[in-house]
């Protein structure tokens, strides 16, 4: 071992092998060799291993809350079912209601474009109204048919979507059929719904 004069600078061990470390020190840049401690060897090996086999990144999980009981796509190709509220609006009871007054008026997907002009011209009037499936003007879901059930009586009707609404907002006559003439008394109810065929609402196949 070589002796050094003067005070030592802080030394940094550099392991050349599991048992020998070099220590840089002194003014004349001499090199002092000393055995590595067992801890130094273990730490050195552990650090090298961590660079060779890094731990995989943690995966993040996201939770999407359900809204209105719907865990479904509203695309026309997807099957839709769930639970929403249903109310009524007497304007849909008017057979002379012009379809220019509803969301599903004209446009490529509009009901006027398909040959209908008034609420009464629709094949299953008065079982018509607004539905959550209609996102806005020219929606692909204009004219979409739903089977709507009131669990209290286990009674169902088929409803044609002609307007935009939260849940379903149908003709009073339609709600009376569903509730055994209790629409005026109940005002709003919870219903279940599912996709139905266009023919269920009277449209041609």
UniProtKB/Swiss-Prot annotation:
Keyword Secreted belongs to the record: yes
Induction (record text): Expression is up-regulated in presence of human keratinocytes.
The entry's keywords: Allergen, Secreted
Family annotation (CDD domains): DPBB_CEPL-like (cd22778)
Superkingdom field: Eukaryota
Protein localization: Secreted
One Pfam family hit: Cerato-platanin
Cellular component terms (Gene Ontology): extracellular region
Main location: secreted
Family: Belongs to the cerato-platanin family.
Designated name of the protein: Allergen Asp f 15 homolog
Lineage: Eukaryota, Fungi, Dikarya, Ascomycota, Pezizomycotina
